[in-house]
From Swiss-Prot:
This is Tripartite terminase subunit 3. The gene is TRM3. The lineage of its organism: Viruses, Duplodnaviria, Heunggongvirae, Peploviricota, Herviviricetes. GO terms for cellular component: host cell nucleus. Belongs to the herpesviridae TRM3 protein family. Component of the molecular motor that translocates viral genomic DNA in empty capsid during DNA packaging. Forms a tripartite terminase complex together with TRM1 and TRM2 in the host cytoplasm. Once the complex reaches the host nucleus, it interacts with the capsid portal vertex. This portal forms a ring in which genomic DNA is translocated into the capsid. TRM3 carries an RNase H-like nuclease activity that plays an important role for the cleavage of concatemeric viral DNA into unit length genomes. One of its GO terms (biological process) is chromosome organization. A motif (Walker A motif) lies at residues 258-265. The active site is at 357 (for atpase activity), 509 (for nuclease activity), 581 (for nuclease activity), 706 (for nuclease activity). It comes from Human herpesvirus 2 (strain HG52) (HHV-2).
Amino acid sequence: MFGQQLASDVQQYLERLEKQRQQKVGVDEASAGLTLGGDALRVPFLDFATATPKRHQTVVPGVGTLHDCCEHSPLFSAVARRLLFNSLVPAQLRGRDFGGDHTAKLEFLAPELVRAVARLRFRECAPEDAVPQRNAYYSVLNTFQALHRSEAFRQLVHFVRDFAQLLKTSFRASSLAETTGPPKKRAKVDVATHGQTYGTLELFQKMILMHATYFLAAVLLGDHAEQVNTFLRLVFEIPLFSDTAVRHFRQRATVFLVPRRHGKTWFLVPLIALSLASFRGIKIGYTAHIRKATEPVFDEIDACLRGWFGSSRVDHVKGETISFSFPDGSRSTIVFASSHNTNGIRGQDFNLLFVDEANFIRPDAVQTIMGFLNQANCKIIFVSSTNTGKASTSFLYNLRGAADELLNVVTYICDDHMPRVVTHTNATACSCYILNKPVFITMDGAVRRTADLFLPDSFMQEIIGGQARETGDDRPVLTKSAGERFLLYRPSTTTNSGLMAPELYVYVDPAFTANTRASGTGIAVVGRYRDDFIIFALEHFFLRALTGSAPADIARCVVHSLAQVLALHPGAFRSVRVAVEGNSSQDSAVAIATHVHTEMHRILASAGANGPGPELLFYHCEPPGGAVLYPFFLLNKQKTPAFEYFIKKFNSGGVMASQELVSVTVRLQTDPVEYLSEQLNNLIETVSPNTDVRMYSGKRNGAADDLMVAVIMAIYLAAPTGIPPAFFPITRTS
């Protein structure tokens, strides 16, 4: 009791002395602190004030009270705040890219700027005028000083210092105080690099380190977690990272998928060992798919701790736990368990839980691990290699596209070039990636050929790390931004008829079935609008019954839609060009064209008093083995070029819908453009890995694609470089 009271009195006395020193110290002593290589926490309040309302002021220790617009300048904010922790950053991490301590020497500033600032003279203000700024300054300064004095922050600083020492020796140091030592098992081989004298981390290893450090700092420092972000930004050399990016490293789960033999487990060993030896009272969990995988990690961590600190501070139960004791009696512990012993981690209270080879652990073990997401001070780090040959051993790929950005995939091939790399047997990396290959692996065409000799596709599925596309795999081809523009931007064609071409194109994709769940007749009326295409009418027609009048019913739907378009745009078109697809039934296609011809001429004749109507033309085709042209269109090899042309125009904003779009079949409560957009969203591209042939389809999840095909083919017929014109009138019979 008396010891606790004495400690409290000493703390209060220290704070009073600190306050008296702050009031007496002068401005000259302030600059001396930084000149001698100190940090901004030694700089007292500089006697100046800013003429800004209090709500627009911000305080930067070592600088003073400024306008808060300075907070929105990342460069200024980063430079000013790095001075807060300058003396605490290990020498190995300060200015190591260029050599020397740039922060203390102010070498990051242009000489002209330094000279200009040195010539500035500020007007002194009365002491009573600067009282609010002085109080605000010391309030913020005391917060950072309390952070510096906290035991948790000291532990973090020691962790950073010791990790820098390990990094300097490429994790070969037998003691944290030494710089040399025998190489450890599977130690990374150093490669001579100009201007580089110590070990480096792979990018994914640095990200794992940042995830672990940021989360432990947030848990241990509590209220000071925000202030320590400045220190960690300086340590990890990310001064311009936004607050959103930093919060990403403090989330409570993350996943890393890394190719084989890239140093995943090798890096986790020193990270876990040093965390145990630096942070007091933490608990770490480590689990893998089998017990044989946890035993070497257990032995390596135990050997590291004993080599660094001696055997007296390390206790372990073989294969289960390792405890590291501190001089004050506190302990840090790591628990090992395999996925075959899920009860080994139940009931534990971890701060970090490493799941090694997570793609290969048992499903019931995954459920046990997920339970730790409910613990506020626990972070789960999944680290695994990939085997994309089986869905059961690549389930973590399902996290792609998650809003929290949980998944981090290390691969040498992007999604766009994956089919080409699969096709070319000598390629091992993507042409658009810079191959930063770890020095302790080999990966070339010979390795790929050898692996595939043992087992086909083993290189792509087991070694490369990316998810190889299976034959028949597909991907969407229309961009989200183009789809949103198609839905929102609809120009008026009734008021801008002068911008439209005089030709109108109609494509009919008939379906002769009464099953409304199967498919229907797609009808699209399209024209040119400047250099773009515009849709005037959309119809998705289903037959009530499959009878002999089906061609007449389909033709009547075409005529009703086309007549409304012509009525809305009087005199705008000189010709109407109709193409009726005849792949399913050529006889029915001819009947549809004949009915459309008859009905349209009757309607145009009744409106003859208003002037001559547009010329009615039909696409004519010569069937195989015949010598007579018939009014139908055979869709053969034109489909793929038509889809590719439409995708290019749609994604570049060259396809629009008229504001006065006509539809007599789509229900009133459904927007015809949205109805078409739903079908367009199902459009996928399938690439054959062996032949690199592209195929397109919209029949995904049982959805219909009739209207989409009609629109795409109508646009292709209207394209200047599309199908050669073969439109002729049907001879009228008396």
